[in-house]
């Protein structure tokens, strides 16, 4: 369960004939409006994120700092019928609000997570659309970018230890892949994209599912690297993960 946070403010709004709300961090943002979650509103201050995702993220230059705007989009076959609407189960159950609060909880536990700034949803009868604004981490490269660039600084052991920390706190990451692991110039590892993530009692089944998903991601982006090379790198990560887990860290 995510703890109550006194720094959260929920502001209802109307957009045309639609109702919605914005949940935001009042220490980072003084005023909010629906336009913050619309790429066109930013004009030349919005730049599409080229890596990962479904064409649903933008870097934005704001008075409250550089941020990432991400609109929630569906993937797979269902996206052909319904690209960005989800079934309404109440404002507190929208994907943007759940992710915002989960990220704040993880930060409170000392985990390397970028700061969520604001979450938005707009209701359409029994459906809704959603978006989220997150602090941009400057100078970072994804694990996928490091691999494709043949970087020698992939920090496999450090990544393994980081994942162990998240699992120790009970985070079941719904999409652990090479695009969602970031490395900054100081060598710090970060984890992003907590949509559909959840805090659970640490258990082998979901931890192994997370790691298996990461391995599939590494194999998918291997390019000219051999399968054996991918498995060797992953084994380095896995050994560090297992050691950290056995030590309770």
UniProtKB/Swiss-Prot annotation:
One of its GO terms (cellular component) is plasma membrane. The active site is at residue 175. It comes from the Bacteria. Coiled coil: none annotated. It is found in: Cell inner membrane. Its EC number is 2.7.1.166. GO terms for molecular function: ATP binding; kinase activity; phosphotransferase activity, alcohol group as acceptor. Pfam families: Kdo. It catalyses: an alpha-Kdo-(2->6)-lipid IVA + ATP = a 4-O-phospho-alpha-Kdo-(2->6)-lipid IVA + ADP + H(+). This is 3-deoxy-D-manno-octulosonic acid kinase. It comes from Xylella fastidiosa (strain M12).
């Amino acid at each position: 369960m995510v703890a109550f946070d006194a720094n959260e403010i929920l502001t209802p709004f109307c957009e045309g004939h639609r109702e919605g709300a914005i949940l935001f961090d009042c220490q980072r943002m003084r005023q909010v409006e629906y336009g913050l979650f619309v790429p066109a509103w930013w004009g030349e201050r919005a730049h599409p994120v080229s890596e990962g995702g479904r064409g649903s993220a933008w870097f934005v230059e704001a008075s409250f700092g550089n941020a990432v705007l991400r609109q929630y989009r569906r993937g797979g076959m269902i996206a052909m019928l319904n690209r960005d609407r989800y079934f309404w189960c109440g404002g507190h159950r929208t994907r943007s609000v759940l992710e915002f609060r989960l990220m704040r909880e993880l930060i409170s536990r000392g985990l390397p997570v970028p700061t969520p700034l604001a979450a938005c949803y707009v209701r359409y009868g029994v459906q809704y659309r959603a978006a989220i604004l997150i602090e941009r981490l400057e100078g970072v490269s994804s694990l996928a970018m490091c691999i494709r660039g043949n970087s020698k600084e992939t920090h496999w052991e450090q990544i393994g230890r980081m994942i162990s920390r998240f699992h120790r706190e009970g985070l079941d990451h719904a999409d652990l892949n090479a695009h969602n692991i970031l490395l900054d110039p100081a060598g710090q590892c970060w984890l992003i994209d907590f949509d559909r993530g959840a805090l659970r009692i640490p258990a082998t089944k979901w931890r192994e599912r997370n790691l298996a998903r990461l391995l599939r991601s590494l194999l998918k982006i291997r390019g000219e690297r051999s399968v054996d090379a991918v498995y060797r790198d992953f084994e380095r990560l896995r050994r560090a993960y297992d050691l950290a887990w056995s030590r309770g860290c």
